[in-house]
Amino acid sequence: MNVIEKISVVMCSYNGEKYIRQQLDSILQQTYPIHEIIINDDISTDKTVDIIKEYMIRHDNIHLFVNSKRLGAHPNFMVALEKASGNYIAISDQDDIWELTKIEKQIACIKGYTLCFSLSRAFGDGVEAYTECRVPNTNVFRLLFYPVIPGHAMLFERSVLSHIPKTDYVVYDLLLALAANLFGGIVACPEVLNLHRRHNSAFSYSKPKNYNKSIFNVFNY
């Protein structure tokens, strides 16, 4: 008999009224049961919170938290991750679309590892999009210098969070990938299971000043 794992989906929202319905629908329609959807809103000024509350009326596994002050993308995710209660956590961007078998296939892949990532295909609204269907190099030395595994592609054991240091200098998905690599291992699910939306208001990654020094310091290297 197959054990049904408790899956927490963690999403951070901010002014996502245009796309968040599509992503919530793709999560709620997953072929694998979703224990809870944790949404941490960073004080949206549009109708994002109202839309989420509409979904909460129909789905009691959606839990909304609204920050008392703006945190920004990375601190917001770190706060949201701590609220997850499932033994596995999947990260969701508010404007992506999941393939309906995403969680089912990642759960099948992750056994024996602490983090599984899928491939993503980007699409855009009026901006140049790309397709990334290659499995990246997840060697720890490669991970030290660039987050080759985006958070929106991850499913990981909750235990990984206990190995993440508190820092404002390193992005959350890089911290997760490094911790999983060092404590249990990373495996790829080599299928495109996430459609990653690219648009002019989407968050983009840039390295902070003194990044290379910071990444070694937070893991005490």
Regions found by a protein language model. Give the residues of each.
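Cell-envelope/extracellular polymer assembly enzymes that use nucleotide-activated donors
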Residues: 5-8, 36, 175
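A conserved acidic beta->alpha catalytic loop
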Residues: 41-50, 69
